Amino acid sequence: MSIGLLLLTIGLPTLVGAILIVPAWLVPRIREISGLAGSALGVALGMALVVAFMCEAGVPSLPPEQKWHMLPIIACGIVILCPVVAIMDGSGELGRWLISIASGAIIGWLAVFPQMDLLGRILLGVWVGVSFMVLSWVSHRRRGITVTLSLTIVFTAMSLLCFESHFITLTLINGALAATAGVGFASALIAEVWTRDEEGKRRSIAIGWGGAFAAASLVPLACFCGWAYTIGDVMWIHWGLVGAAPVMLLFGELPGFHQRHGLVSSFLRVGLVCIPVAVALVLVFTGIDSDDESDGSETHIEMMYSGR
């Protein structure tokens, strides 16, 4: 993997994400536009996946040449729908349930990866729906820095799992998603530290339903795609632990913990997300047998070029 390809595939999507996130979260006049701040992160994540894929694998075709090429196509749909979902933010529990059910059903129907039967697609759809319910609820209660830092950690971990699975394109895509989420974290942190509202209080940025919708869709999608093409030491339990990590933010709302505020409490909640991530990475990197790496790589390449 050349440095130039690495910079292009991760750097360009990150730049696109910065162009979308920074003005929407840091420029007051732009931030006040309805639905813009709440969709910026979601649109940026979707665009990051599409741009990273195109930099490494070219423009996806319709119908896709390989099953996993549905990822950028689904991401395009996420980009289009994020502003709509963001405008629905605050519509109440009915709106939340409708988005959860619809997003889970559509993604479970469209994403057909190798080794995925009907039960697997149902599980993916349920995972997407539950993730949206959790992240959309948490996004109303917690700072943007909490969720964006959590997503940065999760996408970074998924990139490492893909690297160990010899899935280079998805490694770069997850790296681009991690970098874009990192831009969101930096922007949310800057907004909170350096900006004030009319009463002189620190202004917190929320990722909104648009950001929650994109994150709840892309994390399970990337996990299932990585699992479907995994041969070797990276197993379903590792993908499951990392993919379920954002849901750990829900435990930060338990009685006795939910009343804690401030930057320290935000990082404590991020620590909850780190627990399953750390367990998964420790299990992977302590169980890797270098003698099996070549066999896994060859099988993976055969799967890719067979159009699966």
Where in the sequence are the language-model features?
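Short alpha-helical packing/oligomerization segments
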Residues: 225-250
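N-terminal topogenic module of multi-pass integral membrane proteins
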Residues: 1-141, 252-268, 272-308
